[in-house]
Amino acid sequence: MHLIVGLGNPGSQYELTYHNIGFIIVDAICKHWNFQSFSKKADCLITSSVINDNKIMLMKPYSFMNNSGIPVARIRNFYKFSLDNVIVIHDDADLEPGRIKIKKGGGSAGHNGLKSIDSSIGNDYWRLRFGIGRSDSQRSLADYVLSKFSNLDDVIPLVERIAQNIHLMLQGNNIAFTNSIV
């Protein structure tokens, strides 16, 4: 069984912001693969189903980004997920917009959601990094990641391709997955 965690912040004011790309992608996976609606469990939303014979749980922590590790640890421990079967989807300001990278383990690169998860479960889990780039204005990174996508029409097809092809990543075929996205 795999746990796919989409990082983001709860609340309508954060919908469609760069920092909420994890929520956006998890919602797209849920829709594409016909999962049931999310249900609230303490400080997160979860749903589960099967994708190509792989049992999957989708999760959206509702504790705000900087405290994501607490609900992730709670769900991981309760359902006994191996770190090899945990995938965290998050925004990455160090990648150009629309670029994705898959990585296992490593540091947080200053991402507070990853810092929280690392401190709660360690850092040897899979990450699907979604490039959002950086603002070309004088705006701070914190203000930028909490702003709405300026290029949503470009982002939605990419999000849909990720959802359609996530089964390749679940099978460990990261190269085919990445190639199907670009």
Swiss-Prot record:
Keywords: Cytoplasm, Hydrolase, RNA-binding, tRNA-binding
One cellular component (GO) term of this entry: cytoplasm
Record localization: Cytoplasm
Top-level EC class as recorded in UniProt: hydrolase
One of the GO BP terms on file: rescue of stalled ribosome
EC number: 3.1.1.29
InterPro entries: Pept_tRNA_hydro, Pept_tRNA_hydro_CS, Pept_tRNA_hydro_sf
Marked site (Discriminates between blocked and unblocked aminoacyl-tRNA) residue numbers: 9
Role according to the record: Hydrolyzes ribosome-free peptidyl-tRNAs (with 1 or more amino acids incorporated), which drop off the ribosome during protein synthesis, or as a result of ribosome stalling. Catalyzes the release of premature peptidyl moieties from peptidyl-tRNA molecules trapped in stalled 50S ribosomal subunits, and thus maintains levels of free tRNAs and 50S ribosomes.
Assembly information from the UniProt record: Monomer.
Stated name of the protein: Peptidyl-tRNA hydrolase
Species per Swiss-Prot/TrEMBL record: Wolbachia sp. subsp. Brugia malayi (strain TRS)
Gene: pth
